Amino acid sequence: MNRFNFNTVGLFTRDNKATVDFYTKTFGFTTDWDGIQPNVEMTLGDMRIILFPRDAFEQMVSRKFQYPEGFNGTMELAFDVPTFADVDKEYQHALTNGAASVLPPTTEPWGQRTCYVADPDGNLIEIGSFIDK
């Protein structure tokens, strides 16, 4: 048995509602968030993202943080899709739902088709596939 199981990513948001709307519409996450509580849990299959407002977190831990301006180049969320064509399709779907384009779909020398978008808080999201069909 493992000492730890890594199954959740936590994101500190400027606006929980905007972030919930983005992830539910763009990627199909589900949530039973009531729109009032500061803590939001969203799931997609076995993946879980927890959202918490930045200001509420700072109040909880009694300290201020500096957040990246624009795109957050310190981490990414990576989503695999079945085929190269799906990368292109999901990239357009993300843009339609408010994502900012960072890198349009590109086939990399190592054989992956990938693209990058950013969510409303500037977090980088990779959508990629290694299957060219």
What are these regions (language model features)?
Residues 1-8, 30-118, 130-133:
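Vicinal oxygen chelate
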Residues 13-15, 109-110:
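Conserved beta-strand-loop-alpha-helix junction that forms the acyl-donor binding cleft
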Residues 14, 18, 84-85:
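Conserved glycine-rich acetyl-CoA-binding loop
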Residues 19-24, 94, 119-122:
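Conserved active-site tyrosine of GNAT-family acetyltransferases
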Residues 124-127:
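Short glycine-/small-residue motifs
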